[in-house]
Amino acid sequence: MNNKTNNNSVLFDLADGAVRPLGFEVLEVTQQREGRDLIVLVRIDRLDEQPVTMDDLTAASRAAEAEFDRVDPIEEEYRLEFESPGGKRPLLRARHFERMIGLKAKVRSLPGRGEHNFTAPIKAVEGDTVTFEHGGEDLSVNVADIQASLAEFPDRHR
């Protein structure tokens, strides 16, 4: 059986399984090329919502590297890199939006789930529904229907 993949969801699950026992969650996994080199970039956050430190990145990287070496999920050579969410923080779960109430988010609908494409402040979160202040009105959407990221950098850690 060939277990090689370039599927980000498989890589996401592999990385998340390796780092979650250490108190981290994987926010996203992307693959990009720098010249001929393939880079697998893993963006993590701490489950306790404290800032991600360099020591955290090192620990997560070591755990994931061991698992990636064991499973060998990618056919070609690649470089596995880890980073904290920073200013490009993806907002994936209701609790991520809740932490950022008052800040602007860049929002777009997932394919087949509406026609949203806007940047607006996060006003409220109730269950899995996020309300934005958009065009002077409240606009509520389900977290599962959108892809969102922070559009402004917070003045303090949230």
From Swiss-Prot:
Starting at the broadest rank, the lineage of the source organism is: Bacteria, Thermotogati, Deinococcota, Deinococci, Deinococcales
InterPro entries from the UniProt entry: Ribosome_maturation_RimP (IPR003728), RimP_C (IPR028998), RimP_C_sf (IPR036847), RimP_N (IPR028989), RimP_N_sf (IPR035956)
Instruction: Tell me which SUPFAM superfamilies the record gives.
Output: YhbC-like, C-terminal domain, YhbC-like, N-terminal domain
- State the compartments where it is located: Cytoplasm
Listed under GO biological process in this entry are: ribosomal small subunit assembly; translation
Q: Which UniProt keywords apply?
A: Cytoplasm, Ribosome biogenesis
Protein's job: Required for maturation of 30S ribosomal subunits.
Pfam families found in the cross-reference section: DUF150_C, RimP_N
The family this protein is said to belong to: Belongs to the RimP family.
Name assigned to this protein: Ribosome maturation factor RimP
Q: What is its main location?
A: cytoplasm
User: Where does the source fall among the domains of life?
Assistant: Bacteria
Recorded GO cellular component terms are:
cytosol
